[in-house]
Each structure stands twice: as C-alpha cells, then as structure tokens.
Amino acid sequence: MKKLSILAALAASPAMAATGPFFSLSNTNFIVTLAFLIFMGILVYAKVPGRILGMLDRRAVQIRSELEEARALREEARTILASYDRKQKEVQEQAARIVASARDEAQAAAEQAKADLKASIARRLAAAEDQIASAEAGAVRAIREQAISVAVAAASDVLARQMTPAATSASIDESIKEVEARFH
C-alpha cells in the first residue's frame, strides 16, 4: 500500500512543473493533486486495495479450481475416447471374426453339400448298376429258360420221331431202375 501512495505522489510531480506558487488554492494542478491524494487516502482508509486483492485472490482460486476441473474433464474425455477406441477396435475385430466364421461355415457347408452330392451320385450309380446286373441276370435266366424249353421241345420231337413204342417202354423201365438205385 505504501508503494501505491509513493507512486501516486510521484505521479503528481509533473504538476510541480507549473508556474506560480504550487500550494495555492487558485492553482488547479494543486487542487487536482490534493483531490487525488485525498481520494487515494480514502481508498486506503476504506481498505479498498485489500478488498480488491482479496477479490483478485478469490478469482485466482476460482480460476485455478476451474482449470483443475477442466484438466480433470479433459483427462476423463481422453479416458472415454481411449475406451471408445478400444471398444471400436474390439467390435471391428469381433465383426471380422464373425465374417471369417460365417465364411468358414459357408465353405464347410459347400464342401459338405459337394460330399453329399458325390455320395448321392455314387448311391444312384450303384443302384443303377444293381438294376443293370439284375436285368442282365433276369435276361440270362429268361434266355436259359427259353433255351431249355426249346431244347426240351426239340428233344421230345426228335425222340418222338426216332423212338418206337418198344424202345419207349424200355427207356421208361431203365429210368425207373436208375431212380430206384439212386434213392436206395
């Protein structure tokens, strides 16, 4: 406070450069200087500089607390941003894993479908081959039966033309003896 008073007194020193008696009530410079000093004295007496300093100190404390709060908010925002970035990376990785899994499953399903198709084709081929073999066996059997029928008919025609009743009777007797010999 003393420094402020000395500064105010020194600030009034240019008024001393005026002409004429300085300490006269007719000198406006003296009146202005006197009014300024009285005003400064009233301010000092009313403790205005202390109040101003107190207000400035409170404002400085308030600004410091706001700065600390801003720092805390900035750190919290950084933490939230880092958390968001991590979660975004995790989601992207999970999406990539899901896509890869779906691709693998689709590929496995396609391979399974190919294998099932090959197995179905193999079964159908085997069934067709079995049907062909069965048809061949049936055809061979039918041809044999037909050949046997034709051979029996031809043999009976040949035997009927060549055999006499006495030879037929002798052949029947011989066949009966042969059957009896085989059963006994």
Swiss-Prot record:
Pfam family, one: ATP-synt_B
Lyase in keyword set: no
Record's GO cellular component terms: plasma membrane; proton-transporting ATP synthase complex
Record-annotated membrane-spanning stretches: 4-24
Subcellular location: Cell inner membrane
Record's bilayer topology term: Single-pass membrane protein
InterPro entries reported in the protein's UniProt record: ATP_synth_b/b'su_bac/chlpt, ATP_synthase_B_chain
Keywords, in A-Z order: ATP synthesis, Cell inner membrane, Cell membrane, CF(0), Hydrogen ion transport, Ion transport, Membrane, Transmembrane, Transmembrane helix, Transport
Molecular-function annotations in GO: proton-transporting ATP synthase activity, rotational mechanism; proton-transporting ATPase activity, rotational mechanism
Function text: F(1)F(0) ATP synthase produces ATP from ADP in the presence of a proton or sodium gradient. F-type ATPases consist of two structural domains, F(1) containing the extramembraneous catalytic core and F(0) containing the membrane proton channel, linked together by a central stalk and a peripheral stalk. During catalysis, ATP synthesis in the catalytic domain of F(1) is coupled via a rotary mechanism of the central stalk subunits to proton translocation.
Annotated family: Belongs to the ATPase B chain family.
PANTHER family: ATP SYNTHASE SUBUNIT B, ATP SYNTHASE SUBUNIT B', CHLOROPLASTIC
Protein name according to UniProt: ATP synthase subunit b 1
Organism name: Cereibacter sphaeroides (strain ATCC 17025 / ATH 2.4.3) (Rhodobacter sphaeroides)
